[in-house]
Amino acid sequence: MSAIKFNPSSFRKNFKWFENNKNWINFDNAATSIALDVVAEASKEYYQYFCVNPHNKNPEINQKLIAIIEETRDLLAKFFNAKKNEIIFTSSATESLNLFAFGLSSLVKSNDEIILKEDEHAANVFPWVNLAKENKAKLKIIKKTPNKSWTDAFLKACTPSTKLLVITATSNLFGNSIDYEKISKHLKKISPNSFIVVDAVQAVPHHKIDITSANIDFLTFSTHKFYGPTGLGIAFIKSELQSRLKPFKLGGDIFKSLDNNFKIIFKEGPSKFEAGTLNIMAIYALNKQLKFMQKEFNFSEMVFYSKQLKNLAYQLLSQNPNIVLANHDQDVPIFAFKHKYINSADLATFLNIKKIIVRQGSICVGKFKNKESFLRVSLLHYNTKEELLYLEKLLKTSKNSIINELIY
């Protein structure tokens, strides 16, 4: 790995997790990243100094908290090159995707096409399957042909009847990415009234995303995948579409008025989609996290380091005689593979004994449920060359040695 400005050793010093879990290696970062210390500290700070409800807008403490919430919205908008009023707080990316599907239910008609690919995460399948069934829309599940990319498959699948295109920017299982900007430009030309949804959960830690340039309508990610707090999702909805969508949840502070005939007049902007009390503690912690990362680290350098990790991991795994990679078009350091002689469940147990955290199974991808079991290694910026070399050494362990380790 060539010398770069980003220093993973320095970055690791911002995570007490490594002190508290000495000798452990976390290679399951696509499931949840380790949270920065500033996130834990901010969580404690919120409960000790704030812990009030922002729906009460008069007290001074509440006003400070409201300002922090709106500042966080602004920080996210700048990070993604979006408008502040296009950033909506949810509980997770899963909720965001359900929010999108429910909101679009009045805009997707019978025989409209909904396109998604066959190996999507379940959270990005079920809402659209349900929408297609309820609205009698045509659900088009696309497959990738040999020697062609997913981008090519999406471009080929688009027609003037396509109403909704659902894209996972980066696969949680295979680590390959899709050129959603290219697809968006193509689709909007042949079907101007179509909508594009992007699941960016795995892309956000590894790619710079420009929502405005990409001309997408909906996007989501979860903060716990990028060193942030759990229980918080970020949903982007293009401002000009918000008035056309039904809110997924109904409750306090989302409406302007309710007349005698129970007709609801909703508020404009994010408030329409943020019923009830938000996860204020998580938003507060995210605010501190974003400011800390902007001050201390250059995201472009982090993206470059991510590429270096991916290249090294691919080199080590692809050259290992015991390992069969599921694919060879990874764009980020997420790898699914099988061992030639040891099943994935046993291999995961063996690595756990050696204090390496990995993921085993179909990894929430419905296509492989009860069919194939992979072992997944997913890396983030605190992972190191030394950790990968240790993994390589273990994966070269003989079959008999692994079996003996499991038995005894």
From Swiss-Prot:
One of the record's GO molecular function terms: cysteine desulfurase activity
N6-(pyridoxal phosphate)lysine sites (modified residues): 225
Cofactors, names only: pyridoxal 5'-phosphate
Gene: csd
PANTHER family: CYSTEINE DESULFURASE, CYSTEINE DESULFURASE 1, CHLOROPLASTIC
Protein name: Probable cysteine desulfurase
Keywords associated with the record: Pyridoxal phosphate, Transferase
Catalytic activity from the UniProt record: (sulfur carrier)-H + L-cysteine = (sulfur carrier)-SH + L-alanine
Role played: Catalyzes the removal of elemental sulfur and selenium atoms from L-cysteine, L-cystine, L-selenocysteine, and L-selenocystine to produce L-alanine.
Protein family according to the UniProt entry: Belongs to the class-V pyridoxal-phosphate-dependent aminotransferase family. Csd subfamily.
EC number: 2.8.1.7
Keyword ATP-binding annotated: no
Organism in which the protein naturally occurs: Mycoplasma genitalium (strain ATCC 33530 / DSM 19775 / NCTC 10195 / G37)
PROSITE patterns reported for this sequence: AA_TRANSFER_CLASS_5 (PS00595)
